[in-house]
């Protein structure tokens, strides 16, 4: 069977959930025995989101092969339970950069380089490359932005051309739109959807399926009206109601017949669907018996999407412990030693996530100090691990100005320092320690207890590391080195003795957590928080 292609576009407004729609379809097709892969096209000119502010873009999701990508790839991986690659996220910047590099090398033989065909061909190559690399039945591609955005036009033209190249029977266009409900009028308005589809058809794309985000159910009459004016069958108009939990969305879209429509359009000959595992998981999520409150002490807490994988991983850890996780968001700039007790006294665990720069550092250190001294379950991630080492050096070893050389280049005690291979790097984009690396765990540690493995593999995104010049002093003072690189050169995990759960890791465990396969560190952390809750 030739590879099939599904393209998911969006209209009316952004943030409609195209990514969740694509991920949900991927899950449904996988549950029908179809081999799938998903990719995201982002129309911005950045080569990748690695240097973008979290306030601009939300979380940067890192793949096994070290690509810094859009947060939607996190949704894709969590839903389809497969690891993606750098080819799964393509930006305008990446496309233009590759085309210009080819032009400089003379690969266009002196021809005039244009958007059509050179940019569009490069975009199409990225779609075909995923099909080739992954040996899949279906490639699902989400086009970022909304129809009508000038930045999206080369991508839309490219997916229009793909239909001509591979045949109409091998392509399905899904358009996600908004059907707003006007409370005063008491009716759903279909005109925005009609105009969005009109815009799409003007550039040569006729959607096969329209997924309508709505807060009210669409009647058959409303679906028929949308179908009539958008030139599709009424049953190809799918409602996507707001869900209490993201993981309900695949089941809701299945009940609307989305996967059946795609299988019919692409002549996939799918097996009967087996959603039993997913249904069981969703039912479990709806009936959690316990509750814990976790403080998330970060610098971007106003935008929860900046920590979306951490939030999801905490929830996954809760599912494994039959526990609902409530997050108490604490701005690291608002916490200090004098008010830590007041801000943290009602929580069952404290998590300090990753980040960059000096803003909020002292607040993170204050939260970690309180967690250590009050024996409150603590999980530090990336910068959170570095802050844990700094706090320990200051409070236990008495190195009052201990710091990271990132924060204070003049510190007398740079317990966190720039990695040697990072010292001569000038460009910021794509130059950190990125992607999957192995780690050897020490026995008789919390980390070894939860992983139950000597060698683990986790994803990294950092430039700074534990400074080995201080390893002897810090370990002799009671901080355990619980995990290192296999050559023991890099410290990856630290723990504190005589504490119920104090684990800080240099890597990002949240990036590998899945709802059906919660990450073991988060399972252990929430278990410790639950024990803390029950001991009150």
UniProtKB/Swiss-Prot annotation:
The keyword Nucleotide-binding applies. Homotetramer. Catalyzes the ATP-dependent amination of UTP to CTP with either L-glutamine or ammonia as the source of nitrogen. Regulates intracellular CTP levels through interactions with the four ribonucleotide triphosphates. It comes from the Bacteria. Pathway: Pyrimidine metabolism; CTP biosynthesis via de novo pathway; CTP from UDP: step 2/2. GO terms for cellular component: cytosol. ATP binds at residues 15-20, 72. It catalyses: UTP + L-glutamine + ATP + H2O = CTP + L-glutamate + ADP + phosphate + 2 H(+); L-glutamine + H2O = L-glutamate + NH4(+); UTP + NH4(+) + ATP = CTP + ADP + phosphate + 2 H(+). PANTHER family: CTP SYNTHASE, CTP SYNTHASE-RELATED. The gene is pyrG. Residues 1-268 are annotated as: Amidoligase domain. L-glutamine binds at residues 55, 355, 383-386, 406, 463. CTPSs have evolved a hybrid strategy for distinguishing between UTP and CTP. The overlapping regions of the product feedback inhibitory and substrate sites recognize a common feature in both compounds, the triphosphate moiety. To differentiate isosteric substrate and product pyrimidine rings, an additional pocket far from the expected kinase/ligase catalytic site, specifically recognizes the cytosine and ribose portions of the product inhibitor. InterPro entries: Class_I_gatase-like, CTP_synthase, CTP_synthase_N, GATASE, GATase1_CTP_Synthase, P-loop_NTPase. Residues 293-535 form the Glutamine amidotransferase type-1 domain. One of its GO terms (molecular function) is identical protein binding. This is CTP synthase. UTP binds at residues 14, 189-194, 225. CTP binds at residues 14, 149-151, 189-194, 225. Allosterically activated by GTP, when glutamine is the substrate; GTP has no effect on the reaction when ammonia is the substrate. The allosteric effector GTP functions by stabilizing the protein conformation that binds the tetrahedral intermediate(s) formed during glutamine hydrolysis. Inhibited by the product CTP, via allosteric rather than competitive inhibition. Belongs to the CTP synthase family. GO terms for biological process: 'de novo' CTP biosynthetic process; pyrimidine nucleobase biosynthetic process. It comes from Clostridium beijerinckii (strain ATCC 51743 / NCIMB 8052). Mg(2+) binds at residues 72, 142. HAMAP family: PyrG. Its EC number is 6.3.4.2. The keyword Ligase applies.
């Amino acid at each position: 069977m030739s590879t099939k292609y599904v393209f998911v576009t969006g209209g009316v407004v952004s943030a409609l959930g195209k990514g969740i729609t694509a991920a949900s379809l991927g899950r449904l097709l996988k549950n029908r025995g179809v081999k799938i892969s998903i990719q995201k096209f982002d129309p911005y000119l950045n080569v990748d989101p690695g240097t973008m502010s979290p306030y601009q873009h939300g979380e940067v999701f890192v793949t096994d092969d070290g690509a810094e990508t859009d947060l939607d790839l996190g949704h894709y991986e969590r839903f389809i339970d497969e690891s993606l690659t750098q080819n799964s996220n393509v930006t305008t910047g990446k496309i233009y950069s590759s085309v210009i590099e080819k032009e400089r090398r003379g690969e266009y033989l002196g021809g005039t380089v244009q958007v059509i065909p050179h940019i569009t061909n490069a975009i199409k190559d990225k779609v075909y490359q995923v099909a080739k690399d992954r040996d899949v039945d279906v490639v699902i591609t989400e086009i970022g932005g909304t129809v009508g955005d000038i930045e999206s036009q080369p991508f839309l033209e490219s997916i229009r051309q793909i239909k001509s190249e591979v045949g109409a029977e091998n392509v399905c266009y899904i358009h996600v739109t908004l059907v707003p409900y006007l409370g005063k009028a008491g009716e759903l308005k279909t005109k925005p959807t009609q105009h969005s589809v009109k815009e799409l058809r003007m550039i040569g794309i006729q959607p096969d399926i329209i997924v309508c985000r709505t807060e009210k159910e669409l009647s058959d009459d409303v679906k028929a009206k949308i179908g009539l004016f958008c030139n599709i069958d009424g049953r190809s108009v799918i409602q996507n109601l707001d869900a209490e939990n993201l993981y309900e969305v695949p089941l809701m879209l299945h009940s609307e017949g989305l996967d059946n429509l795609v299988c019919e359009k692409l002549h996939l000959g799918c097996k009967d669907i087996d959603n039993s595992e997913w249904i069981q998981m969703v039912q479990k999520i709806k009936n959690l018996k316990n509750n814990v409150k976790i403080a998330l002490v970060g610098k971007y807490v106003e935008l929860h999407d900046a920590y979306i994988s951490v939030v999801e991983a905490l929830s996954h850890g809760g599912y494994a412990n039959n526990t609902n996780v409530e997050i108490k968001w604490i701005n690291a700039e608002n916490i200090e030693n004098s008010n830590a007790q007041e801000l943290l006294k009602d929580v069952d665990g404290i998590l300090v996530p990753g980040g960059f720069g000096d803003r909020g550092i002292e607040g993170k250190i204050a939260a970690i100090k309180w967690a250590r001294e009050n024996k409150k379950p603590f999980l530090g991630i990336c910068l959170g691990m570095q802050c844990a080492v700094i706090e320990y050096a200051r409070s236990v070893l008495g190195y009052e100005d201990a710091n990271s050389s990132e924060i204070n280049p003049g510190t007398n005690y740079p317990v966190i320092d720039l990695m040697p291979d990072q010292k001569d790097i000038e460009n910021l984009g794509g130059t950190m320690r990125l992607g999957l690396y192995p780690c050897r765990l020490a026995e008789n540690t919390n980390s070894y207890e939860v992983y139950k493995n000597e060698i683990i593999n986790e994803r990294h995104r950092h430039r700074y590391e534990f400074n080995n010049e201080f390893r002897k002093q810090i370990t002799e003072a009671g901080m355990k080195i619980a995990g290192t690189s296999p050559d023991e050169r890099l410290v990856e995990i630290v723990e504190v003795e005589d504490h119920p759960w104090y684990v800080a890791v240099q890597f990002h465990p949240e990036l590998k957590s899945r709802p059906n396969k919660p990450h073991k560190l988060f399972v252990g952390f929430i278990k410790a928080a639950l024990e803390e809750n029950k001991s009150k």
